Amino acid sequence: MIASVRGVVTATGPDHAVIEVGGVGLAVQCAPGTIADLRVGQPARLATSLVVREDSLTLYGFADDNAKALFELLQTASGVGPRLAQAVLAVHTPETVRAAIANADTAALTRVPGIGKKGAERLVLELRDRIGPVPVGGDGAAGVTTGAWPEQVRQALVGLGWTAGQAEQAVAAVAETVDGEVPPVPVLLRQAIRLLGRTR
């Protein structure tokens, strides 16, 4: 199993990054918040989880081992595969997910595209006793503020399945709320997803 990768970022997209390790470029599937912290040409380390299927080998990457552990735990619930587990971490921080499951906050879980009320209830039922300690206070978001945040958020939303038009409207709405210091990209992304969730 490939537990982590360290190397130079050679490319990024809405849902993946390419990390060059020993002359080999590894395509790593990542949540938008993780990609937002990567810079092409700069070194990076990602905790990784290798998902093996009959016809594919897919490497998923995370900012830290906490997110990776939650990704793997989510997949032990009925009906949750790697793509849905990754979508959960695209919408919420690991701390928020743990709190939502521990507190049976199905409303927070249904903000994730692909999770309905029954799916959220199933996650709570199956994982509540295994979710681990829930941190108190803060949402755990972290990121590097850049002037290019609108494009980063727009690309991330399209990568999560919304149309370019929907992404544009959400970015415009979020931009109106930004006053002074710009929050980290993952925070802005979650705000945009919440706005889009209300209009679905």
Swiss-Prot record:
Primary location: cytoplasm
Q: Where is this region: Domain II?
A: 64-142
Q: Which GO terms describe its cellular component?
A: cytoplasm; Holliday junction helicase complex; Holliday junction resolvase complex
Name the UniProt key words of this record, in alphabetical order. Answer: Cytoplasm, DNA damage, DNA recombination, DNA repair, DNA-binding
Compartments reported by the entry: Cytoplasm
Location of region: Domain III: 151-200
What are the start and end residues of every segment in region (Flexible linker)? 143-151
HAMAP family to which the protein is assigned, alphabetical: DNA_HJ_migration_RuvA
Output the SMART domains linked to this UniProt entry: HhH1 (SM00278)
Pfam families the record matches: HHH_5, RuvA_C, RuvA_N
Q: Which domain of life is it from?
A: Bacteria
Q: What is this protein called?
A: Holliday junction branch migration complex subunit RuvA
Q: Which family does it belong to?
A: Belongs to the RuvA family.
| InterPro entries to which the protein is assigned, alphabetical | DNA_helicase_Holl-junc_RuvA_I, Hlx-hairpin-Hlx_DNA-bd_motif, NA-bd_OB-fold, RuvA, RuvA_2-like, RuvA_C, RuvA_C_sf
**A GO BP term, please?**
DNA recombination
Give one GO molecular function term: ATP binding
* Function statement: The RuvA-RuvB-RuvC complex processes Holliday junction (HJ) DNA during genetic recombination and DNA repair, while the RuvA-RuvB complex plays an important role in the rescue of blocked DNA replication forks via replication fork reversal (RFR). RuvA specifically binds to HJ cruciform DNA, conferring on it an open structure. The RuvB hexamer acts as an ATP-dependent pump, pulling dsDNA into and through the RuvAB complex. HJ branch migration allows RuvC to scan DNA until it finds its consensus sequence, where it cleaves and resolves the cruciform DNA.
Q: What is known of its domains?
A: Has three domains with a flexible linker between the domains II and III and assumes an 'L' shape. Domain III is highly mobile and contacts RuvB.
Its quaternary organisation is: Homotetramer. Forms an RuvA(8)-RuvB(12)-Holliday junction (HJ) complex. HJ DNA is sandwiched between 2 RuvA tetramers; dsDNA enters through RuvA and exits via RuvB. An RuvB hexamer assembles on each DNA strand where it exits the tetramer. Each RuvB hexamer is contacted by two RuvA subunits (via domain III) on 2 adjacent RuvB subunits; this complex drives branch migration. In the full resolvosome a probable DNA-RuvA(4)-RuvB(12)-RuvC(2) complex forms which resolves the HJ.
Q: Where is this region: Domain I?
A: 1-63
